[in-house]
Amino acid sequence: MQRLSAVSPNNYTFTDVAELDVTDAGAVRQAVAQTRAEVIVNCAAYTNVERAEEDEAAADRLNRGAAENLARAAEANGATLIHVSTDYVFDGTAHLPYTEDAPTAPLGVYGRTKLAGERAVAESGCKYLTFRTAWLYSEYGNNFLKTMLRLTAEKERLNVVFDQAG
């Protein structure tokens, strides 16, 4: 997004955790008011699915609390919130893509806290869009594609599951 914004005539503000603690409601309200944001994109999340089972409070602070803070600030300032969520809000048993009105049934802490974040956004009164994503990858961070590229350079043979869809 930052690279694309360089060629846009619009103004964009990007923050990271060092600049804005989205779990701090006051800091979020102040940042949104100061920037006069018209659109807020919430990409903040506690994404370590396994660790979330051990640290539910931290997962909840980011996945529900931060979403609620951003939604309330958006509502107070007339901004639209674009909220990034996950397919983990479902139980994973569907054989077809989920529709937006499919019943949710998260199986773990990560999915439950992301669903709680979706609900907090919906109940805030702000204008919003929620995107439920799956299998994201990029040149940044850890992801399946980067892992496979690294392993092919390290090993002569790989065993990879091929019965998963996303």
What are these regions (language model features)?
Residues 1-39, 117:
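N-terminal Rossmann/SDR dinucleotide-binding element
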Residues 4-5, 74, 121:
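A generic structural signal for well-ordered alpha-helical segments
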Residues 15, 40-44, 81-86, 91, ...:
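SDR active-site strand-loop-helix element
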Residues 25-64, 75:
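NAD(P)H-binding glycine-rich loop region in Rossmannoid oxidoreductase-like domains
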Residues 50-57, 92-96, 141-142:
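Conserved catalytic-core motifs of eukaryotic protein kinase domains, centered on the activation segment
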Residues 61, 66-69, 89-131, 135-136:
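Catalytic helix-loop patch of NAD(P)-dependent Rossmann-fold dehydrogenases
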Residues 76-80, 126:
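A short helix->loop->beta-strand "cap" motif at the edges of active sites that frequently abuts
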Residues 122-166:
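NAD(P)-dependent short-chain dehydrogenase/reductase
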